[in-house]
């Protein structure tokens, strides 16, 4: 999918399935309310749980998160780019559907070249939640995504990064590991 077509598709509320570090992810424009509702419905994920947002560069995340100190940013980049997700206080502009019932947003600068290129071509950060029905095993291939979601999502080809487990999730403020 070409960059302009991808941008148009996402800005129009489209949902994609794409390869990430460990599995295929479902993604959409993180600022499009209709797309967020659609993704949550397709996945069967409760709104209260919140979603992860990935980016190619930190700058793609800045409008969604509250300002961070230079020390906090440095801490984040000890793990980025890579499969490490930080819980960062959300900005007032961050959609409630992204945060769920939380005051923080889960964010990651991806090391997966395909996912990073998607963010670059889309011109934005992307939602990244595992491509599965809530509570089920995530899809590892485009074929599995087609089988699970049919025509409800645009499946983009590619291979996952080969990581065997989902990204670690850590709270930036407290340092607590939420998911090892």
From Swiss-Prot:
Keyword annotations of the record? ATP-binding, Cytoplasm, Nucleotide-binding, Nucleotidyltransferase, Transferase, tRNA processing
Domain YrdC-like, by residue range, is 1-180
Where does the protein principally reside?
Answer: cytoplasm
| Broad class of enzyme this protein falls into | transferase
**Any idea where this protein resides?**
Cytoplasm
- Cystine pairs: none
* UniProt GO cellular component terms: cytoplasm
Q: Which Gene Ontology BP terms does the record give?
A: regulation of translational fidelity; tRNA threonylcarbamoyladenosine modification
Q: Note the InterPro entries from the entry.
A: DHBP_synth_RibB-like_a/b_dom (IPR017945), Sua5-like_dom (IPR006070), TC-AMP_synthase (IPR023535), TC-AMP_synthase_SUA5 (IPR050156)
State the PANTHER family in the record.
SUA5 (PTHR17490), THREONYLCARBAMOYL-AMP SYNTHASE (PTHR17490:SF18)
Name the family the entry cites.
Answer: Belongs to the SUA5 family. TsaC subfamily.
Q: Report what the protein is called.
A: Threonylcarbamoyl-AMP synthase
What taxonomic lineage is listed for the species of origin? Bacteria, Pseudomonadati, Pseudomonadota, Betaproteobacteria, Nitrosomonadales
């Amino acid at each position: 999918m070409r960059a302009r077509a991808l941008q148009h598709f996402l800005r129009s509320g489209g949902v994609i399935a794409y390869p990430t570090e460990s599995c295929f992810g479902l993604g959409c424009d993180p600022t499009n309310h209709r797309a967020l509702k659609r993704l949550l419905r397709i996945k069967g994920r409760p709104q209260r749980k919140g979603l992860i947002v990935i980016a190619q560069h930190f700058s793609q995340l800045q409008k969604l998160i509250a300002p961070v100190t230079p020390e906090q940013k440095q801490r984040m980049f000890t793990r980025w780019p890579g499969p490490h997700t930080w819980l960062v206080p959300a900005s007032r502009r961050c959609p409630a559907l992204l945060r769920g019932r939380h005051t923080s947003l889960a964010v990651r600068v991806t090391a997966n070249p395909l996912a990073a290129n998607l963010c670059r071509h889309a011109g934005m950060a992307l939602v990244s939640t595992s491509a599965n029905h809530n509570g089920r095993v995530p899809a590892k291939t485009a074929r599995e995504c087609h089988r699970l979601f049919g025509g409800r999502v645009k499946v983009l080809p590619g291979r996952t990064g080969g990581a065997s487990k989902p990204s670690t999730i850590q709270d930036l403020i407290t340092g607590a590991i939420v998911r090892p």
